[in-house]
């Protein structure tokens, strides 16, 4: 496969107004995507966004480019990323487009695409779009231009979809749940789903102003929801990220339950009910404790590259359904075509009710190995992973840990970061060797 010029592991992402995330580029991207999609069926796409203020500007630019290529557009407004995947299928669209930078700050934004079946766009289609980007932009004839319409009932459709993934014989009545929507795209969705299923809902992170998405709230900033769960004596907490494709949970003691533990709980419930297809897929970053816990249950476990698109690819290759990442991307292909934070949370709630256990009790089935993750920022053009001192530091750590741990060093697919991960059966060793490697990376970048 050719190297990608614009698309990263999760679409196109960057700082608003710079490089790729500006009106001119995004209009051209819309046109190029329209050229690739044109003539393939309905000539219709849908566009949704999170709550960043730049979403309005980028939505208009995409709309203009797509229209120039003869594509009709359905505008969803603020909607979770998994909702756009689902609605792409239900509206029989050629593609769904998401304007979001997920868990990043408000000044970043991005564009990613879903195919007609609600899955991430294939690599060859992304490459075809990139090829069109290098051609001069030309409008179709005036009578062939696309039109845009606002879709009024999108939120209600998705709320019903979420509720449909919760067993009809179960109820959340009697449960007190804190839900943190990160001032993001789920702010008008998740509280309604939980309350309509019977829960008492306490909301935080549900007042977006265009600038506060992911700011000290949500799945990447857990203090707010931990404090709220304890303050309100809630049974558990849901923490979603800005676009709703990942979730972290909090038990009634205030312990954070991460994506690896969520995958374990969902897989265990599926196994107990006879619905587990084969095994489970994690990534090279998944905690060794997940692999050990699943092995105890007799469940096979495979690791993919980091990124939910690669988890999805391996699930499809294996014919399995359940997988995810520690960061809270959780997939269950029996329920949704992509990672869905709300649906994953509902599946954990169903597992609790089926087992008549608290979240804390369920999570004890998996013992996490101490894992230290350090992110080191690097400048464009630097190649710290090629530095001999960095390579030597990794070899030293691997030699010292032996079979008691593992080391992973990788470049982020979405940000200029080197991710240093060390896992060991002893927390002190994990921290010591992660710091050792991170120091070598910092020196290699001139820090």
Swiss-Prot record:
It comes from the Bacteria. The lineage of its organism: Bacteria, Pseudomonadati, Pseudomonadota, Gammaproteobacteria, Alteromonadales. HAMAP family: GlmM_B. Catalyzes the conversion of glucosamine-6-phosphate to glucosamine-1-phosphate. Mg(2+) binds at residues 102, 241, 243, 245. The active site is at 102 (phosphoserine intermediate). Pfam families: PGM_PMM_I, PGM_PMM_II, PGM_PMM_III, PGM_PMM_IV. GO terms for cellular component: cytosol. This is Phosphoglucosamine mutase. It comes from Pseudoalteromonas atlantica (strain T6c / ATCC BAA-1087).
């Amino acid at each position: 496969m050719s190297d990608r010029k614009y698309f990263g592991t999760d679409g196109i992402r960057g700082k608003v107004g710079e490089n790729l995330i500006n009106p001119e580029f995004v209009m051209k991207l819309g046109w190029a995507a329209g050229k690739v999609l044109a003539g393939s069926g309905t000539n219709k796409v849908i566009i949704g966004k999170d709550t960043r203020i730049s979403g309005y500007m980028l939505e208009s630019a995409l709309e203009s480019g797509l229209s120039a290529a003869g594509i009709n557009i359905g505008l969803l407004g603020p909607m979770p990323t998994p909702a756009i995947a689902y609605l792409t299928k239900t509206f029989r669209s050629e593609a769904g487009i998401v304007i979001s930078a997920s868990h990043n700050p408000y000044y970043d934004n991005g564009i990613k695409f879903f195919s007609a079946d609600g899955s991430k766009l294939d690599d060859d289609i992304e490459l075809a779009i990139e090829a069109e980007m290098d051609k001069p932009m030309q409008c179709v004839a005036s009578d062939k231009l696309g039109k845009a319409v606002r879709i009024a009932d999108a939120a209600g459709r998705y709320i019903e979809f979420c509720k449909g993934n919760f067993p009809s014989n179960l109820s959340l009545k009697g449960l007190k749940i804190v839900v943190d929507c990160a001032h993001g795209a789920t702010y008008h969705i998740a509280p309604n789903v939980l309350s309509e299923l019977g829960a008492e809902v306490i909301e935080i992170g549900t007042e977006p102003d265009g600038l506060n998405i992911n700011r000290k709230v949500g799945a990447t900033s857990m203090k707010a929801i931990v404090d709220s769960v304890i303050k309100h004596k809630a049974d558990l907490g849901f923490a979603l990220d800005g676009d709703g494709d990942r979730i972290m949970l909090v038990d009634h003691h205030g312990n954070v339950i991460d994506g690896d533990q969520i995958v374990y709980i969902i897989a265990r419930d599926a196994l107990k009910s006879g619905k587990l297809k084969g095994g489970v897929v994690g990534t090279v970053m998944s905690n060794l404790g997940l692999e050990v816990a699943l092995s105890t249950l007799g469940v096979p476990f495979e690791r993919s590259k980091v990124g939910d698109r690669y988890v999805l690819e391996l699930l499809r290759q294996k014919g399995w359904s359940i997988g995810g990442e520690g960061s809270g991307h959780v997939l269950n292909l029996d329920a949704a075509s992509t990672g869905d934070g709300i649906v994953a949370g509902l599946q954990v709630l169903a597992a609790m009710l089926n087992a008549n256990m608290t979240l804390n009790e369920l999570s004890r089935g998996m013992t996490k190995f101490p894992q230290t993750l350090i992110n080191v920022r690097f400048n464009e053009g630097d190649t710290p992973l090629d530095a001999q001192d960095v390579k030597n530091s990794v070899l030293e750590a691997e030699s010292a840990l032996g079979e008691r741990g593992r080391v992973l060093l990788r470049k982020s697919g979405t940000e200029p970061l080197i991710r240093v991960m060390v896992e060991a059966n002893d927390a002190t060793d994990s921290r010591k060797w992660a710091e050792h490697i991170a120091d070598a990376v910092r020196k290699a970048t001139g820090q």
